[in-house]
Swiss-Prot record:
PANTHER family: LBH DOMAIN-CONTAINING PROTEIN 1 (PTHR14987:SF1), PROTEIN LBH-RELATED (PTHR14987)
Region (Disordered): 1-36, 205-289
Any one GO CC term of the record: nucleus
A Pfam family: Lbh
Tissue expression notes: Expressed in bladder cancer tissues (at protein level).
Location of the LBH domain: 1-128
Stretches with biased composition (Polar residues): 15-25
Biological process according to GO: positive regulation of DNA-templated transcription
Full protein name: LBH domain-containing protein 1
Length: 289
């Protein structure tokens, strides 16, 4: 801030024609704006004037003793700048020949609150289209990327084959093994785990029926030979599993049942029908019993 100090009373009155007066033509002091507002005086190295450029707006105040009752008035406004917010983008490359600056490849995008919400809603709607998935790691697009496994010409069934549905859906199983009959078999798919219940092969249908009928014959024989409630400790036929479940279980234990049938079980006086059911006992013993 620059100030123009006035003279003290000891120096005498400050008249207009005195050499120290601001209205004197040879005076180095600044003119008073109350007399001449159109002129802008020049300051040329006066010892009582100090100029400071620390602030953006510089004022000069004068306290002349001629008007002791007047308040301090501004003389001159050197600069008054309005600071606007700006965005500075540093250049990545400089062409030495032409001197052109190459800006970075990243685009600078400024969105207001309303535009940001609209853009977010737009990308969410686009992500629900078939063939699009969220992928923030894709350098081409920060929000979505196209699934290369799908094409726009494919049907909905082919799309379901690539994407696992959230709801549990039963689909027909493919024939993975040539000797297995996949007709009537179903595969229940839930999430990423497949649960398959396949029917036994056609070549083992006769052996399966024999294995299923064997426990029923044993139970009937045990019921006839033990009227008093004594007999083999085996589960009853009415409490057995359904035919389909029994068939699935016998498929897993098919070879085990055949191996047990080939072996000769020990003689059990309480269950003589075991030898007849498996066919491993001698006919003479069976007739005596």
């Amino acid at each position: 801030m620059a100030l123009v100090p006035g003279r003290s009373k000891e120096d005498g009155l400050w008249t207009r024609n005195s050499p120290g007066s601001s209205q004197h033509p040879e005076s180095p002091r600044l003119p008073n704006p109350l007399w001449d507002r159109g002129k802008i005086g020049k300051v040329e190295g006066h010892q009582h004037i100090q100029v400071s450029t620390s602030s953006a707006c510089v004022w000069q105040l004068a306290y002349p003793p001629v008007w002791p009752n007047l308040p301090a008035v501004p003389i001159q406004d050197f600069s008054q700048k309005s600071h606007l917010p700006s965005i500075v983008v540093e250049s990545s490359e400089v062409n030495e020949e032409s001197g052109d600056l190459h800006l970075p490849h990243e685009e600078l995008l400024l969105l207001t609150d309303g535009e940001e919400e609209d853009a977010e809603a737009f990308f969410q709607d686009q992500s629900e289209e078939p063939g699009w998935a969220w992928s923030p790691q894709d350098p081409r697009s920060p929000l979505r990327t196209f699934n290369a496994g799908l094409s726009w010409g494919q049907d909905q069934d082919e799309e379901d084959a690539c994407w696992i549905l959230e709801d549990t859906a039963c689909l027909e199983a493919t024939n993975h093994c040539p000797f297995w009959d996949s007709t009537g078999s179903r595969v229940c798919r839930s999430g990423f785990v497949e649960y398959s219940h396949l029917l036994p092969p056609n070549s083992f249908e006769g052996a399966e029926e024999e294995a299923v009928q064997t426990p029923a014959g044993v139970e009937s024989g045990a019921a006839s030979e033990a009227p008093g409630g004594r007999g083999c400790d085996r589960p009853r036929a009415d409490h057995a599993a359904p035919p389909q479940e029994a068939g699935v279980q016998c498929t897993c234990q098919h070879y085990t049942v055949r191996e047990e049938a080939q072996k000769t079980p020990p003689a059990d006086p309480a269950c003589p029908e075991r030898e007849d059911s498996h066919g491993s006992g001698s006919p003479f013993k069976a007739s005596q019993d």
